Amino acid sequence: MANTTFKGTLRSEGGYSSIATATGTGTETTQMSISSADFASLDANKLATEAGTGITGGTGTIYRSSVIREGGIIKTSILIDLTGLRSTASGDIIGVDGTSNVCHIGQITAARNGTILAGRMTCFEAPTGGDPDINVHSATEGTGVEDGAISSLTETLLVNAGDATLGSVVIFTAVPAADEFQYLTLGDTTNADNTAGKLLIALFGYEA
């Protein structure tokens, strides 16, 4: 269908949706919608590659991502409930216990997330069960698994956070490069599943 340009007010009583249609299959995916209840949803605005199943497969685990462009600033958010994810030993990757599923929490790309300039991690619920000393690394590989040493990857420590406590905010001392994957890692040793813990990672970038 050709482009259509309207001048003046466009009105729709039942809401509005913008869709994308997959080439070949014709499958339609909602990119953006505004419901008749005044609820706006930007469905397509998330990481191009979200967390591996070594994160999303946890029992009780919640993972969501968001990418929003406001003017010249691109904000990437990753929200995680750690429930069901295993902590093991210092320097190891956090994820679902006893699996070989990849445990990154998403990939940063210049096309989607821009060039990252700064980052922070906020704790909305202190981790319990597992160890609360949780750090964030990036790595060029997306193959890291639970209980694997982050040092076995080509990695960079983004923040040495110390123990996460309710309301704690830590600022990244390094930022991920384009195409790198993010990982949650342990800064201490407690070999157990998390029974609580809510973290929000926010990365701020720009289009170079």
What does each of the following model-derived ranges do?
Residues 1-19, 66-72, 207-208:
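Short, intrinsically disordered N-terminal pre-domain segments
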Residues 22-64:
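Fibrous stalk/shaft segments of extracellular and virion attachment machinery
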Residues 61-97:
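Extracellular receptor-binding modules and their adjoining Ser/Thr/Gly/Asp/Asn-rich linkers
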Residues 90-94, 105-108, 170-174:
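Beta-strand-rich interaction surfaces with strong enrichment in secreted/lumenal proteins
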Residues 98-138, 200-206:
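Beta-rich globular "head" domains
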Residues 126-177:
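Terminal beta-strand-rich extracellular "head" domains
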Residues 172-193, 197:
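Noncatalytic modules at the cell exterior or secretory-pathway interfaces
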Residues 192-194, 205-208:
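Ser/Thr/Pro-rich, low-complexity mucin-like regions
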